[in-house]
Amino acid sequence: MQYKTKTFLVIFLAYLVVTNEAEAFWSFLVKAASKILPSLIGGGDDNKSSSKRKREIEDFFDPYQRELDLELERLLSQLQ
């Protein structure tokens, strides 16, 4: 009985090691496929739309940034 329990424990631990390795392997394959497939299918437009959205966000916050820059310049000129 003791022998079967130890054997079962070793097999179970080996299974955990193998599944962790398999999980890392499959996640690597999925990450690689998610990067390669859009470029093969023609998903290059996503990068353009992403940069467009980024510019829209920058334009949205840009007036506030200009006001802060002017305020900072005014404060710095007072220090000099």
From Swiss-Prot:
Say where the protein is mainly found: secreted
Q: Does the keyword Membrane apply?
A: yes
Location in the cell = Secreted; Target cell membrane
The Gene Ontology biological process terms listed for this entry are: defense response to fungus; killing of cells of another organism
Residues of the signal sequence? 1-24
Tissue expression notes: Expressed by the venom gland.
Main function: Antimicrobial peptide. Has antifungal activity against all strains tested (MIC=12.5-200 uM). May act by disrupting the integrity of the bacterial cell membrane.
Under which name does UniProt file this protein?
Probable antimicrobial peptide clone Con10
Organism field: Opisthacanthus cayaporum
